[in-house]
C-alpha cells in the first residue's frame, strides 16, 4: 500500500535513520557527533592561537594582519583619515625564517625505507617493497604533501598527510595507493587522547569539508534531504557544526573497532585465529593448538557522513588510521593541549620591528626642510627658481651679487640653514 501521508516514512526515519537500508547506523552517527564535539572542545583554545599565528605569518602591507585592530584605529588607517594618519608599515621578515627551516626539509626530505629485521626477512623482498613505495610517492606527487605538512608544522604548529586509494581509471576496478596532501590542517580533528606524535595510536579521526548545499544535493541525490536532516537535529545543539546557512559539512570519519577472537599457537611458532582457513589447515597438520589466548582484533572503518546520515562506508585495508600528524611544539598545561610553531615566539619581535620602521618613516616625513639663507637682494629676479629649489632639480641657481660692505667685496652665496 502506498504511503501517501508520509507517516510511515517518518517513522522509518525515526527508527533507522534517514537511510532505511542502514538501520543501526544511528549509534555510529551519535558517537561520531559526540567525538567531533569532543575534538572541537579540546582543540578550541590552541587552534584559535594557531589561526592567529597563520594570519600573522600571512600578513602583508595590503591586509595589515600584523597590526592590532585597536592600534590601526588610533593611527587612522581604518578610518581613511589623511590629516592625522600615521604610517602602519608591514615589513614581514617571518617568511625568510620559516623558509630557512622548510628549505632544509626540501633538501633532505624524509624517506620511507624497508629494512629486513629478523631471520625470516628477505632482502630481495625488502628491495621490492622499497620500489613499490617509491612508485607510490612518484604517482602521488608526495613531495607536495610532505612540503605542505612541513610548512604548516613550522608556521603554526601542525600539519597532516593522508594515505588513500583511488581507482586507476574509469574502466577499472584496480586501485592505486596514494599519499595525499591536506592543505587545511584545521579541517582535521584527531583523537585528542593520542600520545604518539604522529597519531599512530589514534582511535578515530575526522577530515571535514564544508560544501554548498546545491553541490551537496548534486553529489548525493539519494541522501536524505537537508530539511530531513534539520528535523533530525531539532534539540541537538551540535547541528550548527554540520549545517550552516548556505553550506553543509561532509566528514570522512575513520574509527577503529575491536573484535574478540581466539588466537591459536601451533608448532613452529605458527599462529592463526580460530575459524579461519589458516587455522583449519594448521589443525589438520598439527592437531590441537599448543596455546590459545583471547585477542582484540583491530579493524579500521571508514565512512562519509553529514552528521545525521551515512553517505558512504567501507572497511579500510590497514591496521592504522591513514592520517599522519606532523607536529611542532607541543605542550600540555593543566590538561589542555597547546601546539605552536616558529611564528608564535617571533610575533612580538616582528611587531616591534614594524613599529620601528613606521616611526622612522614618520620622523623622516615630518622633518622640516632646511631653508636657504641669503642677503637681501640676492634673490631678486630669480624668485621662482629659489622657491622651487627643494622640489625641482634645477641644473643651476643664479643670484645677484650684493656689495654692501663698503669695500667692494662680494658677500657669500646663499647657504642652507644647518
Q: Predicted regions span which residues?
A:
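Extended, charged amphipathic alpha-helical segments
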Residues: 265-418
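Extended, helix-rich architectural segments
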Residues: 1-312, 316, 388, 415-418
Amino acid at each position: 500500500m502506498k504511503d501517501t501521508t508520509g507517516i510511515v516514512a517518518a517513522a522509518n526515519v525515526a527508527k533507522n535513520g534517514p537511510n532505511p537500508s542502514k538501520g543501526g547506523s544511528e549509534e555510529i552517527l551519535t558517537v561520531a557527533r559526540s567525538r567531533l564535539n569532543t575534538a572541537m572542545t579540546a582543540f578550541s583554545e590552541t587552534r584559535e592561537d594557531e589561526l592567529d599565528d597563520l594570519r600573522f605569518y600571512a600578513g602583508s602591507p595590503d591586509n595589515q594582519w600584523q597590526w592590532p585592530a585597536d592600534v590601526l584605529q588610533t593611527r587612522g588607517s581604518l578610518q581613511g583619515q589623511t590629516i592625522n594618519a600615521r604610517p602602519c608599515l608591514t615589513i614581514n621578515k617571518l617568511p625568510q625564517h620559516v623558509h630557512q627551516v622548510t628549505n632544509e626539509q626540501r633538501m633532505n626530505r624524509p624517506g620511507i625505507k624497508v629494512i629486513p629485521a629478523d631471520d625470516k626477512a628477505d632482502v630481495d623482498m625488502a628491495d621490492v617493497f622499497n620500489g613499490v613505495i617509491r612508485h607510490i610517492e612518484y604517482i602521488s606527487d608526495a613531495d607536495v604533501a610532505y612540503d605542505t605538512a612541513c610548512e604548516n608544522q613550522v608556521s603554526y604548529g601542525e600539519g597532516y598527510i593522508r594515505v588513500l586509494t583511488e581507482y586507476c581509471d574509469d574502466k577499472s576496478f584496480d586501485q592505486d595507493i596514494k599519499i595525499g596532501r591536506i592543505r587545511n590542517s584545521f579541517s582535521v580533528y584527531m583523537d585528542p587522547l593520542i600520545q604518539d606524535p604522529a597519531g599512530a595510536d589514534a582511535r578515530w579521526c575526522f577530515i571535514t569539508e564544508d560544501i554548498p548545499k546545491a553541490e551537496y544535493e548534486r553529489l548525493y541525490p539519494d541522501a536524505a534531504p537537508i530539511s530531513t536532516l534539520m528535523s533530525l537535529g531539532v534539540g541537538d545543539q551540535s547541528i550548527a557544526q554540520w549545517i550552516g546557512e548556505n553550506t553543509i559539512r561532509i566528514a570522512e570519519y575513520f574509527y577503529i573497532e575491536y573484535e574478540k577472537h581466539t588466537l591459536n599457537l601451533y608448532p613452529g611458532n605458527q599462529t592463526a585465529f580460530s575459524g579461519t582457513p589458516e587455522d583449519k589447515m594448521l589443525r589438520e597438520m598439527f592437531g590441537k593448538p599448543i596455546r590459545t589466548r583471547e585477542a582484540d582484533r583491530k579493524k579500521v572503518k571508514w565512512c562519509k557522513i553529514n552528521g545525521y546520515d551515512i553517505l558512504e562506508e567501507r572497511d579500510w585495508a590497514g591496521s592504522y588510521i591513514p592520517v599522519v600528524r606532523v607536529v611542532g611544539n607541543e605542550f600540555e598545561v593543566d590538561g589542555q593541549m597547546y601546539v605552536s610553531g616558529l611564528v608564535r615566539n617571533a610575533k612580538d619581535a616582528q611587531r616591534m620591528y614594524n613599529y620601528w620602521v613606521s616611526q622612522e618613516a614618520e620622523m623622516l616625513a615630518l622633518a622640516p626642510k632646511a631653508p636657504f639663507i641669503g642677503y637681501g637682494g640676492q634673490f631678486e629676479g630669480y624668485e621662482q627658481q629659489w622657491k622651487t629649489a627643494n622640489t625641482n632639480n634645477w641644473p643651476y641657481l643664479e643670484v645677484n651679487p650684493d656689495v654692501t660692505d663698503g669695500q667692494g667685496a662680494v658677500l657669500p652665496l646663499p647657504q642652507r640653514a644647518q
